[in-house]
Amino acid sequence: MQPNRPIRQALLSVSDKTGIVEFAQALVQRGVKLLSTGGTAKLLADHGLAVTEVSDYTGFPEMMDGRVKTLHPKVHGGILGRRGTDDEVMSQQGIEGIDMVVVNLYPFAATVAKPNCSLEEAVENIDIGGPTMVRSAAKNHQDVAIVVNNSDFNAILAEMDQHQNSLTLETRFDLAIKAFEHTAQYDAMIANYFGQLVKPYFVAEEEDAEAKCGQFPRTLNLNFIRKQTMRYGENGHQKAAFYVEQDVKEASVSTAKQLQGKALSYNNIADTDAALECVKSFDEPACVIVKHANPCGVALGADILAAYNRAYQTDPTSAFGGIIAFNRELDAKTAQTIIDRQFVEVIIAPTVAEEAKALLKAKKNVRVLECGEWSGTQQRLDVKRVNGGLLVQEADLGMVDLADLKVVSKRQPTEQELKDLLFCWKVAKFVKSNAIVYAKDNQTIGIGAGQMSRVYSAKIAGIKAQDEGLDVAGCVMASDAFFPFRDGIDAAAKVGIQCVIHPGGSMRDQEVIDAADEHNMVMVLTGMRHFRH
């Protein structure tokens, strides 16, 4: 076990300068000498701090427009030198020990995220000296502290005060892990960016570069941070943890703030994600109740209490122990209605009123989450693990509106039927395939999910409605994919379905349309499928 290592000299070179002046001032107060480069050195000097520029220390100026600053033996020897082993050679070469390296890297991700970022601009924002120093310091964590997160400044100073300006090996090891995570993420971003460009950059302009490459890199590097570990996974014998992306801007289960309740389980997170993503697709006050990642009740209302009452009415049996999501603030009256009526695992809403928080405290096991408001959805990739590989695709963010609908039946829909069709279609997108949804007046009446046969999904939707005493007559029906045969339309007509919305695209589309006309039903095609597996 290495002893605590005192910090006598620190090298500071940062792109994100948040808090760096205050941290440097605190180091100087503790007797630490400062080395620095370029803009960081100027900032520290402007604040009256005694700082030695790396170029003065090495005897070599910064050159090539800043491309070469710290790539020098006197820098890396000072970082990599093993105390007690390399002391003699360091002394012979005039190399001073560097006990702390404070570095964060050029903002590559922010640069390439700009709409008009050129390859040349991206290249100039690839940090070379920074990652090299970070890796050197992390490798020699036995003797050197590497700091890549500005949020660690205060904790480092506190520990130095506890240990006579030293940091423990445990802390240096933890900082080294963060450093390797930091450089791994940085290199992954660069590899992904170049992997997307390789063909478009080298093919002739007239060739279809997008078709040859598209947005998928040659190698896929994913970087997620562990947010929590769990007692178990989907089942009791499976270990599990939850990892999240950095810099997610939209409201999501990964960024939501938990106000109360036990830690979220694996299944809680999966179901809450399904509920939240569904409710986010509606503009009017809406409620979505989810069980086993499938909506079991969805409704709109004049307010969220009305929406909840109608969503619950679809399937009270399945709603027991479910997840409830809202797209408006959770108020006290709605919260009280929920806890009086049913057992619920998770409630998630953009915000929760103070009165509602006070009421929910009486049910301490109910997990309550605030996800914040949302204004849009970020484009992202969906990843699914298969044995030996990953399936990667664009997230299904496709939606349709009135202008996209194609009426193919003889009977034309009324204005209310069109509203119900669009509502029903939005819900079907979030139901496991094969998905059939019955709806009326912006309320789900029956949901059939996850069946191998589309006809059986329709039958289950009807059975669910019948069991809850809901009238299917006059409902609209949505199907996440086309009807391969007319039998689904015939079955729907028997229970009183008046309108059907589906993507179309079957070889037997005309046969299916003819069936709708025979039953005097409205049939609308979207041209967009929503398989969900």
Curated annotation (Swiss-Prot):
Residues that span the membrane, as ranges: none
Family matches, as HAMAP family: PurH
Matching SMART domains: AICARFT_IMPCHas, MGS
Reaction equation(s) it catalyzes: (6R)-10-formyltetrahydrofolate + 5-amino-1-(5-phospho-beta-D-ribosyl)imidazole-4-carboxamide = 5-formamido-1-(5-phospho-D-ribosyl)imidazole-4-carboxamide + (6S)-5,6,7,8-tetrahydrofolate; IMP + H2O = 5-formamido-1-(5-phospho-D-ribosyl)imidazole-4-carboxamide
EC number: 2.1.2.3, 3.5.4.10
Swiss-Prot/TrEMBL keywords: Hydrolase, Multifunctional enzyme, Purine biosynthesis, Transferase
Protein's UniProt name: Bifunctional purine biosynthesis protein PurH
Similarity field: Belongs to the PurH family.
UniProt GO cellular component terms: cytosol
Native organism: Pasteurella multocida (strain Pm70)
CDD domains: IMPCH
PANTHER family hit by this protein: BIFUNCTIONAL PURINE BIOSYNTHESIS PROTEIN ATIC, BIFUNCTIONAL PURINE BIOSYNTHESIS PROTEIN PURH
Metabolic or biological pathway: Purine metabolism; IMP biosynthesis via de novo pathway; 5-formamido-1-(5-phospho-D-ribosyl)imidazole-4-carboxamide from 5-amino-1-(5-phospho-D-ribosyl)imidazole-4-carboxamide (10-formyl THF route): step 1/1; Purine metabolism; IMP biosynthesis via de novo pathway; IMP from 5-formamido-1-(5-phospho-D-ribosyl)imidazole-4-carboxamide: step 1/1
